[in-house]
């Protein structure tokens, strides 16, 4: 099931090709804070695996690193880089609870996984 939650006053980035109505109510996973911008916090179990973020460095499991989604045109893609050219703001948390998240945000995002 796909659900859409809206926070703040976003503008249409045209990232979604299908019109999805906004879901009312509380987000079912983790906590949302808007005190200092937007923050999503989810406490993972020890065995949870996180997939996604497109062309991000490191291995397939994204746990244990801080990724910055901020399109840069840096020709040196090394392990210590936190941001690469593409911004693919989609993750899947697989474990006790399994769910996916897409953050439709056209500016800098930090994923501290």
Give the positions of each predicted feature:
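Catalytic and substrate-binding clefts that recognize carbohydrates or anionic sugar/phosphate headgroups
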Residues: 1-113
């Amino acid at each position: 099931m796909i659900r859409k939650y809206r926070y703040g006053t976003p503008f249409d980035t045209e990232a979604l090709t299908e019109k999805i109505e906004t879901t009312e109510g509380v987000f079912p996973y983790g906590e949302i804070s808007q005190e200092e911008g937007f923050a999503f916090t989810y406490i993972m179990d020890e065995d949870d695996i996180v997939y996604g973020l497109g062309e991000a460095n490191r291995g397939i499991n994204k746990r244990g690193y801080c990724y910055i989604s901020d399109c840069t045109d840096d020709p040196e893609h090394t392990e210590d880089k936190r941001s690469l050219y593409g911004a693919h703001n989609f993750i899947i948390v697989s474990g006790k609870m399994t769910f996916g998240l897409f953050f439709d945000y056209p500016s800098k995002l930090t994923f501290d996984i």
